[in-house]
């Protein structure tokens, strides 16, 4: 395997591609935006026909990724920490229903409100 020097968000995106995702869904919000942008322009993602989609909000992004997982496909959903609050309803319900194909939720917190209107530790959702 070829070694590449990647930024953190690029490594997350490349790991998802290498892990066999069939789709990535996101709502733009720094610092999570760059994960989806990397997948959108990655030649390997295009060759593998990975579905790449921006959603109208975090809830619909999560629901679309969850639907892909219910269909037996692997998916990735990306959002910033305040977006997880928007997606909380389907997120908490999916903890009960489970997933089938695999679902990775990439939530980017902003310590010290670096790029957000508030500070939140999303690990409390765990």
Give the ranges of each region predicted by the language model.
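Thiamine diphosphate
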Residues: 1-126
């Amino acid at each position: 395997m070829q070694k590449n020097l990647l930024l953190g968000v690029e490594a997350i995106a490349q790991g998802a591609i290498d892990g066999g995702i069939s789709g990535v869904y996101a709502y733009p919000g720094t610092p999570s935006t760059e994960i989806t942008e990397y997948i959108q322009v990655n030649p390997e993602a295009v060759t593998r026909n990975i579905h790449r989609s921006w959603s109208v909000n975090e809830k619909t992004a999560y629901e679309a990724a969850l639907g892909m997982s219910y269909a037996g496909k692997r998916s990735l959903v990306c959002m910033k920490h305040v977006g997880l609050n928007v997606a909380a309803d389907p997120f908490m319900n999916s903890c009960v229903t489970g997933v089938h194909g695999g679902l990775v939720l990439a939530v980017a917190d902003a310590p010290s409100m670096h790029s957000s209107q508030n500070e939140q530790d999303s690990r409390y959702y765990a």
